Amino acid sequence: MVGYDAKADVRSNSKLEVAVAGSVSGFVTRALISPLDVIKIRFQLQIERLCPSDPNAKYHGIFQAAKQILQEEGPRAFWKGHVPAQILSIGYGAVQFLAFEELTELLYQANLYQTHQFSAHFVCGGLSAGTATLTVHPVDVLRTRLAAQGEPKIYNNLREAIRTMYKTEGPFVFYKGLTPTVIAIFPYAGLQFSCYRSLKRAYDWLIPPDGKQTGNLKNLLCGCGSGVISKTFTYPLDLIKKRLQVGGFEHARSAFGQVRSYRGLLDLTQQVLQEEGTRGFFKGLSPSLMKAALSTGFMFFWYELFCNLFHCIRREDR
């Protein structure tokens, strides 16, 4: 179960088990959804409309983009930036789930958990994700740069990317886009955790448990639903974050169409509104929703699966 549960205390996992389950969950999920992530980033960074009628648009649909990336860059392009992305996922998953379990237990002990469970999961989910974000944000910037570049590559590997970015743009380059990231991640993760719990309760109400082992399917479906809900509400901030993260990297984006430079969060928002309209804030929403559904579904699925596995191993050892 995700979050502290006093009734299930006898089968609670240790802090190490929670961290490992979160890390493995992040690792497996990232490997599976990386192609959608690459397509989503390409859409978010494209200035032109995502429309077949626009002759200047390099990408205008999920399948068209996938086909073009495959033809121009080969299948490995769908895992561009995968090494930093995996470092990001492993570290993020460990910190997020460990912080969430600790925070929900803290609220339970303060008698604030039982009567406000949706709010408790929202706040704890947001705070745990914020903590994880501050920990791994430099890796997220590296992942975005590596996934966004075309051919020929500006950075051939992770080490070269770190060295070049630090030398040409300074140490603060690794925290580009941090403000919108933190602003976006709190409600996004908060909704992920709170909606996940609510959807599981709704699932049990619609399909009462009959003793059969259907928990894994329930975790997957409810995770997918919570991912779609949370991403829909917070997507514009995700787009803003991605565009800020590639600031100073415009020369590597020239092959993809128009490029823009932004002085900050407000300047970016104004430029997008003026040039692309409100729909500009939702570029790449389709692959992003697909990714959010799969990534959140798999995240909770694998996390609960490994937590249960650790519990079974400990029970067998007794």
Swiss-Prot record:
Membrane topology of this protein: Multi-pass membrane protein
Source organism, top-level taxon: Eukaryota
Membrane-spanning intervals of the chain: 19-39, 87-107, 122-142, 173-193, 220-240, 293-313
Record Pfam families: Mito_carr (PF00153)
Classification via InterPro entries: Mit_carrier, Mitochondrial_sb/sol_carrier, Mt_carrier_dom_sf
Main localisation: mitochondrion
Coiled-coil spans in chain: none
UniProt-listed PROSITE patterns: SOLCAR
Solcar repeat ranges per the UniProt record: 13-106, 116-202, 214-309
Catalytic activity: thiamine phosphate(out) + thiamine diphosphate(in) = thiamine phosphate(in) + thiamine diphosphate(out)
Gene Ontology molecular-function annotations: antiporter activity; thiamine pyrophosphate transmembrane transporter activity
Entry's Gene Ontology BP terms: thiamine diphosphate biosynthetic process; thiamine pyrophosphate transmembrane transport
One Gene Ontology cellular component annotation held by this UniProt entry: mitochondrion
Disruption phenotype: Deficient mice are embryonically lethal, with death occurring on or before day 11 of the embryo development. Knockout of Slc25a19 causes mitochondrial thiamine pyrophosphate depletion, embryonic lethality, CNS malformations and anemia.
Keyword list, A-Z: Antiport, Membrane, Mitochondrion, Repeat, Transmembrane, Transmembrane helix, Transport
Its job: Mitochondrial transporter mediating uptake of thiamine diphosphate into mitochondria. It is not clear if the antiporter activity is affected by the membrane potential or by the proton electrochemical gradient.
Family recorded in the similarity comment: Belongs to the mitochondrial carrier (TC 2.A.29) family.
Name of the protein this chain belongs to: Mitochondrial thiamine pyrophosphate carrier
Organism: Mus musculus (Mouse)
Lineage: Eukaryota, Metazoa, Chordata, Craniata, Vertebrata
